């Protein structure tokens, strides 16, 4: 999988333009409202998109993962389209912060949590892509191997017929060497793309897990200052813990159990759903200390 450098540079340039526009938009909302723009769902989704674009630019520019935009661009497009086109206008307006959010911990806690969601979602998306491509790869590989085996057998029969020898004299090593088409199978043994995809998913999820841990700890300190206790089993807190345990399991499977490939990718794919439940699903309930009105964070 070798992307065209011209297309890759064009894509990176497009991401740079998107990053500038998102940054400008967030700054204008910050100046207009007088506080960091994280008071409702619209602003949090904008910041999530900003974090995803930043991660995309970082990974492509510094880690030379030129293929990443092929998978992340559609997801980002859907996210921004949902943010701007689906949410009601009243939810897109800047609002004054409720008393519970009027704290310096807002920037420390909420930004870190959303940054963790961005990294985790990106890593999980790569896990999903890994599973899809590996399935396609294995199916294509099996098909090609069957075709290759059939062609080799046909060539072997021709050799046997032309040389008037018995089939028993054709040994297994001879069978493997017969026919120039055998080299075709080597093309399907190159798994460097899958290794890169697997490692990139692992590293991105690891970054997201670190941010998630910091976000939970900072949230606990803020909760103690605001409500008098570090943990209250609020729905948001509970699902944040579930999210943390899910990705702790993922990292444990990689670091301790030594899993690679499809096994941890399945955990990452499951984590994709868990993150969205923690980020959006809990707010749909409209209950708990983290609910400050309909669709607000």
Question: How would you label these PLM feature ranges?
Answer:
Residues 141:
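Extended substrate/cofactor- or partner-recognition/assembly subdomains adjacent to catalytic sites
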Residues 1-94, 101, 105-135, 145-187, ...:
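Hydrophobic cores of alpha-helical transmembrane segments in multi-pass integral membrane proteins
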Residues 138:
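Acidic, metal/ion-handling microdomains and their immediate structural contexts
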């Amino acid at each position: 999988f070798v992307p065209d450098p011209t297309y890759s540079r064009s894509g990176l340039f497009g991401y740079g333009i998107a990053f500038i526009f998102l940054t400008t938009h967030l700054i204008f909302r910050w100046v207009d409202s007088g506080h960091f723009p994280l008071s409702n769902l619209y602003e949090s989704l904008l910041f999530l998109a900003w974090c995803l674009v930043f991660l995309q630019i970082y990974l492509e520019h510094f880690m030379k993962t030129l293929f990443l935009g092929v998978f992340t661009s559609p997801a980002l497009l859907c996210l921004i389209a949902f943010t701007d086109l689906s949410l009601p206008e009243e939810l897109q307006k800047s609002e004054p912060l409720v008393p519970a959010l009027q704290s310096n911990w807002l920037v420390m806690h909420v930004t870190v949590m959303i940054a963790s969601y961005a990294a985790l979602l990106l890593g999980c998306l790569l896990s999903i892509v890994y599973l899809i491509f590996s399935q396609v790869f294995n199916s294509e590989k099996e098909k090609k191997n069957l075709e290759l085996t059939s062609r080799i057998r046909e060539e072997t029969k021709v050799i046997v017929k032309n040389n008037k020898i018995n089939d028993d004299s054709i040994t297994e090593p001879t069978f493997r060497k017969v026919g120039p088409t055998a080299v075709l199978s080597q093309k399907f043994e190159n798994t460097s793309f899958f290794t890169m995809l697997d490692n990139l998913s692992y590293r991105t999820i690891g970054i997201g897990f670190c941010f998630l841990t910091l976000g939970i700890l900072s949230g606990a300190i803020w909760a103690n200052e605001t409500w008098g206790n570090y943990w209250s089993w609020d729905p948001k807190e509970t699902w944040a813990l579930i999210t943390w345990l899910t990705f702790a399991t993922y990292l444990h499977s990689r670091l301790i159990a030594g899993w690679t490939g499809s096994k941890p990718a399945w955990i990452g794919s499951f984590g994709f759903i868990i993150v969205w439940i923690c980020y959006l699903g809990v707010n749909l309930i409209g209950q708990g200390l983290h609910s400050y009105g309909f669709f607000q964070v």
